[in-house]
Swiss-Prot record:
The keyword Cell membrane does not apply. One of its GO terms (cellular component) is host cell nucleolus. It comes from Human immunodeficiency virus type 1 group M subtype B (isolate SF33) (HIV-1). This is Protein Rev. HIV-1 lineages are divided in three main groups, M (for Major), O (for Outlier), and N (for New, or Non-M, Non-O). The vast majority of strains found worldwide belong to the group M. Group O seems to be endemic to and largely confined to Cameroon and neighboring countries in West Central Africa, where these viruses represent a small minority of HIV-1 strains. The group N is represented by a limited number of isolates from Cameroonian persons. The group M is further subdivided in 9 clades or subtypes (A to D, F to H, J and K). The gene is rev.
């Protein structure tokens, strides 16, 4: 894997194999039995899945050496965010997404509330 040493690759692959074994050890519940029995089996299966997910996160965070908690994203103050469509925005709906324009002063069009 790019940017990693051979030793950490082996550790990561071992961790992935362990996680795969954990998930394989908890197959889907059987569809036989009464409605209540099926419901109980599904409930217990979901609880085991949650435990396996938690264990998997702990294994990966140990191997990768970082926290599984996301790093908080610093956002600019909402009162300074404006929509800037002075450039050709297009109609695809995807252009300009991901890079908000921050203007110190709001455009006069947004402040006046009247059409010209």
């Amino acid at each position: 894997m790019a940017g990693r040493s051979g030793g950490s690759d082996r550790e990561l692959l071992t961790a992935v194999r362990i996680i795969k074994i954990l998930y394989q050890s908890n197959p889907h519940p059987s569809p036989e039995g009464t409605r209540q029995a099926r419901r109980n089996r599904r409930r217990r299966w979901r609880e085991r899945q949650r435990q396996i997910h938690s264990i998997s996160e702990r294994i990966l965070s140990t191997v990768l050496g970082r926290s599984s908690e996301p790093v908080p994203l610093q956002l600019p103050p909402l009162d300074r965010l404006t929509l800037d469509c002075s450039e050709d925005c297009g109609t695809s709906g995807t252009q300009g997404v991901g890079s908000p324009q921050i203007l110190v002063e709001s455009p006069a069009v947004l402040e006046s509330g009247t059409k010209e």
